[in-house]
Curated annotation (Swiss-Prot):
Gene Ontology CC terms: cell surface; extracellular region
Name of encoding gene: sle1
Top EC category: hydrolase
Domain Peptidase C51 per the UniProt entry, residue ranges: 210-334
Region (Disordered): 71-90
Catalyses which reaction(s): Hydrolyzes the link between N-acetylmuramoyl residues and L-amino acid residues in certain cell-wall glycopeptides
Native species: Staphylococcus aureus (strain NCTC 8325 / PS 47)
Protein location: Secreted; Cell surface
Name of protein: N-acetylmuramoyl-L-alanine amidase sle1
Signal peptide start-end: 1-25
A GO MF label: lytic endotransglycosylase activity
SMART domains tied to this protein: LysM
GO biological process per UniProt: cell wall organization; defense response to bacterium; division septum assembly; killing of cells of another organism
InterPro entries: CHAP_dom (IPR007921), LysM_dom (IPR018392), LysM_dom_sf (IPR036779), Papain-like_cys_pep_sf (IPR038765)
Length: 334
């Protein structure tokens, strides 16, 4: 009887050892569409804080195809600040969480305009893991001559593969449609797109696609075409640029954030306490107030916002989720 017990213990220990070895074997995880930091941390038996620490994440925002470290020690930022060289000429930098074009440009003694030119970017959106050219000459492959032609599909409609630097408004302008139509065709309820993503640009929405029509239902939304005169790197500077990117340009004369609700109302915008994708969250709290861009409205009532000069230095783009119970603390400019 004693021998059987010992054998059982040995067998159980062996199985546990194999399971532990298999779990430890996975050191990285490639993010899949729809995944969250919670789901990934739960899968590998680590805390969200540990997962964020391993990958130097400053928010819970992750992107499809992003490679995350799930075991080991945290990445050193000293190596990430050194650009890698390429046999084709020029140096490259891998975007880290919290980076912005201006921040990267200052690291390498160049301008954000030059980095945009080198990489064929036409907006300020970058994402962790993206490889950017920071010196050399612009590659001819950055021209979007081929990518601007949508592929056809036997199921009806045409499709476009998202390139680095694309936005929904930019894609819509290429194909003579609206960003709202593209959102409807693809069942999108926020403005997040990523390189390699396949978007339907013509045809009819599939039966399982969600509708994005609620993003601006019944709202007065004047559109301005002003130059951005807000102070670089401030919350107002970022929100002005994000609204321009989605084709809903705002005035450059609303001054400090604590004046935006009154100024927007005077310009004819709808102001209420209901967040929608693309709206501006505004508060008078603080000396100058604060504004944020609503990127996503979650099913639980919380919202994902992008902002500058809140939890990081001016010019650094950050994301955070505002809990549902705090959503009504803000006014929303539509």
């Amino acid at each position: 009887m004693q021998k059987k017990v010992i054998a059982a213990i040995i067998g159980t220990s062996a199985i546990s050892a194999v399971a532990a070895t298999q779990a430890n074997a996975a050191t990285t995880h490639t993010v899949k569409p729809g995944e969250s930091v919670w789901a990934i941390s739960n899968k590998y038996g680590i805390s969200i804080a540990k997962l964020k620490s391993l990958n130097n994440l400053t928010s819970n925002l992750i992107f499809p195809n992003q490679v995350l470290k799930v075991s080991g020690s945290s990445n050193s930022t000293s190596n990430s600040s050194r650009p890698s060289t390429n046999s084709g000429g020029g140096s490259y930098y891998t975007v880290q969480a919290g980076d912005s074009l201006s921040l990267i440009a200052s690291k390498y003694g160049t301008t954000y305009q030059n980095i945009m030119r080198l990489n064929g970017l036409n907006n300020f959106f970058i994402y962790p893991g993206q490889k950017l050219k920071v010196s050399g000459t612009a590659s001819s492959s950055n021209a979007a001559s081929n990518s601007s032609r949508p592929s056809t599909n036997s199921g009806g409609g045409s499709y476009y593969t998202v390139q680095a630097g694309d936005s929904l408004s930019l894609i819509a302008s290429k194909y003579g449609t609206t960003y709202q139509k593209i959102m409807s065709l693809n069942g999108l309820n926020n403005f997040f797109i990523y390189p390699g993503q396949k978007l339907k640009v013509t045809g009819n929405a599939s039966t399982n696609s969600g509708s994005a029509t609620t993003t601006n239902r019944g709202y007065n939304t004047p559109v301005f075409s002003h130059q951005n005169l807000y102070t670089w790197g401030q919350c107002t500077y970022h929100v002005f640029n994000r609204r321009a990117e989605i084709g809903k340009g705002i005035s450059t004369y609303w001054w400090n954030a604590n004046n935006w609700d009154n100024a927007a109302a005077a310009d004819g915008y709808t102001i209420d306490n209901r967040p929608t994708v693309g709206s501006i969250a505004q508060t008078d709290v603080g000396y100058y107030g604060h504004v944020m861009f609503v990127e996503r409205v979650n099913n639980d009532g919380s919202i994902l916002v992008s902002e500058m000069n809140y939890s990081a230095a001016p010019g650094i783009l950050t994301y955070r989720t505002v809990p549902a119970y705090q959503v009504n603390n803000y006014r929303y400019i539509h």
